[in-house]
Amino acid sequence: MPGLVDSNPAPPESQEKKPLKPCCACPETKKARDACIIEKGEEHCGHLIEAHKECMRALGFKI
């Protein structure tokens, strides 16, 4: 029927075939970190910067 949403989403093949790029990893912590740095300055966002680093390390990035 037209107008129905496909209930079978495409499998996440991109992560299986291509390695995750640092720019695409941890989008939640990256967004929070970047917003804090822009609004308050890097010196006030250490906890968010560290949280993003921990997330990146958990995904295998060496930071």
Curated annotation (Swiss-Prot):
Molecular-function GO terms, alphabetical: copper chaperone activity; copper ion binding; cuprous ion binding; enzyme activator activity
Domain of life of the organism encoding this protein: Eukaryota
Role this protein plays: Copper metallochaperone essential for the assembly of the mitochondrial respiratory chain complex IV (CIV), also known as cytochrome c oxidase. Binds two copper ions and delivers them to the metallochaperone SCO1 which transports the copper ions to the Cu(A) site on the cytochrome c oxidase subunit II (MT-CO2/COX2).
Listed InterPro entries: Cys_alpha_HP_mot_SF, Cyt_c_oxidase_Cu-chaperone
UniProt main location, coarse: mitochondrion
One Gene Ontology cellular component: cytoplasm
Region annotation (Disordered) ranges: 1-20
Subcellular localization, as worded in the UniProt entry: Mitochondrion intermembrane space; Cytoplasm
Phosphoserine modified-residue sites: S14
Cysteines paired by S-S bonds: C26-C55, C36-C45
Name of the protein in question: Cytochrome c oxidase copper chaperone
UniProt-annotated binding residues for Cu cation: C23, C24
Organism: Homo sapiens (Human)
UniProt PTM comment: Acetylation by KAT8 promotes assembly of the mitochondrial respiratory chain complex IV (CIV).
Primary gene name: COX17
Annotated tissue distribution: Ubiquitous.
Cited SUPFAM superfamilies: Cysteine alpha-hairpin motif
Positions of short motif Cx9C motif 2: 45-55
Gene3D superfamilies tied to this protein: CytochromE C oxidase copper chaperone
Gene Ontology biological process: copper ion transport; generation of precursor metabolites and energy; heart development; mitochondrial cytochrome c oxidase assembly; positive regulation of cell population proliferation; positive regulation of cytochrome-c oxidase activity
Quaternary assembly: Interacts with COA1. Interacts with the chaperone CHCHD4; this is important for correct folding and the formation of disulfide bonds that stabilize the structure.
Protein family per UniProt: Belongs to the COX17 family.
The entry's keywords: Acetylation, Chaperone, Copper, Cytoplasm, Disulfide bond, Metal-binding, Mitochondrion, Phosphoprotein
Motif (Cx9C motif 1): 26-36
Domain CHCH: from-to ranges: 23-63
Residue list for modification N6-acetyllysine: K18, K30
